[in-house]
Regions:
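Divalent metal-binding pocket/active-site signature
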Residues: 1
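Histidine-acidic metal/acid-base catalytic patches
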Residues: 5-31, 37-140
Length: 140
């Protein structure tokens, strides 16, 4: 069930139309990385096409079939050799557009999967992943 703006050209048109009607850059796009993976989107190309319109992201991982909301880098194939989501392409696309917007981890199912007594360590890991993404996106 692809939703509105799953097609990047439609998303660009829609955001540009809304901003033109507003008379200023009032609207931007929220990229749900897990949903893009479910619909086999090339993240790098999708991000590049959005360009400056990309304002925030919901970052999470899945198996390519179900919207699981797990930690980035969680799902691999070929005995751990290949990630299901092209995280390198994702980072490259963000670097190419000079992304400096917000990131949001959508990992609630991951949190519910672990015992409460390890939640502090899990939150530390999520924070470390956030630093990883920021450093990779902004590296010179």
């Amino acid at each position: 069930f692809e939703g509105p703006c799953a097609d990047v050209e439609e998303a660009v048109w829609y955001i540009d139309k809304l901003n033109a009607e507003a008379g200023f850059e009032a609207f931007s796009f929220c990229l749900d990385v897990g949903h893009a993976n479910l619909y086999a989107r090339n993240l790098r190309e999708y991000i590049k096409a959005l360009g400056h319109r990309l304002g925030i992201m919901h970052i999470h991982d899945n198996d390519g079939q179900t919207d699981l909301h797990m930690l980035p880098y969680s799902y691999v194939r070929n005995n751990g050799k290949d990630h299901i989501i092209d995280w390198d392409g994702f980072i490259a696309g963000l670097r190419e557009i000079g992304y400096r917007g917000n990131i949001c981890f959508e990992t609630f199912r991951c949190m519910s999967a672990f015992p409460k007594d390890v939640h502090p360590q899990l939150l530390d890991l999520i924070c470390a992943l956030g630093r990883h993404f920021v450093n990779a996106i902004t590296a010179e």
